[in-house]
Amino acid sequence: MKVENHNLAVASLKTQRISAFKARLVAVLLKGKKVSDALAILAHTKKKASPIFTKLINSAVANAINNHGFEHSNLIIKAAIVNEGPTLKRFRPRAKGAASQILKRTSHFKVILASQNGGESQNQEYQEAEKNLVSKSPENTQSGALSQQIRGEQPQNDPENGVDSQLSAKTNSTTTAKKTDLADNNTKNDATNTVLAQEKEVK
């Protein structure tokens, strides 16, 4: 079961001609900032990735306002992700007919915006859904029935989880059968002991 978070707005940009290492130097400055503060930081950061992130944040803000109805003042940057893209391999001629390799790296950018209002309620819904999935799993159902048997309790009938009282009846019947077998063995041992004692007295 997948719980969708409607408090997030995402914008992505792929195959940009910049290395992921250089772009991440700018990405670390944006996480957790408000949109207005992030744009101000990018305006005063003289890096190649700054205009790329500015374009991407503006796109994410437009998605948040048009698709989700968020307010611009409540938006914060939850994540600024930079992944490596395909690398273009070229060569440069060198002396004596040799050649050296040139790696033209690319990167994929992604910006995730979150709304400050309603984030806690969404996290609570996700946690409740996760708890329901864990409680209704068959492994937890079987473990609960076994724990009740160990304590000597009879599990209640639960049609949703498939727990039935037949399981407890079977276990009770097996335990009673074992007890009767032990009692029979004890009586047999007592009879043999009395016979041996009588034989010793006769001798």
Curated annotation (Swiss-Prot):
GO terms for molecular function: rRNA binding; structural constituent of ribosome. InterPro entries: Ribosomal_uL22, Ribosomal_uL22_bac/chlpt-type, Ribosomal_uL22_bac/org-type, Ribosomal_uL22_sf. Residues 116-203 are annotated as: Disordered. The keyword Ribonucleoprotein applies. Residues 116-126, 134-167 have a biased composition (Polar residues). Keywords: Ribonucleoprotein, Ribosomal protein, RNA-binding, rRNA-binding. The keyword RNA-binding applies. GO terms for biological process: translation. Residues 168-194 have a biased composition (Low complexity). Pfam families: Ribosomal_L22. GO terms for cellular component: cytosolic large ribosomal subunit. Part of the 50S ribosomal subunit. NCBIfam families: rplV_bact. This protein binds specifically to 23S rRNA; its binding is stimulated by other ribosomal proteins, e.g. L4, L17, and L20. It is important during the early stages of 50S assembly. It makes multiple contacts with different domains of the 23S rRNA in the assembled 50S subunit and ribosome. The globular domain of the protein is located near the polypeptide exit tunnel on the outside of the subunit, while an extended beta-hairpin is found that lines the wall of the exit tunnel in the center of the 70S ribosome. Belongs to the universal ribosomal protein uL22 family. This is Large ribosomal subunit protein uL22. It comes from Mesomycoplasma hyopneumoniae (strain 232) (Mycoplasma hyopneumoniae).
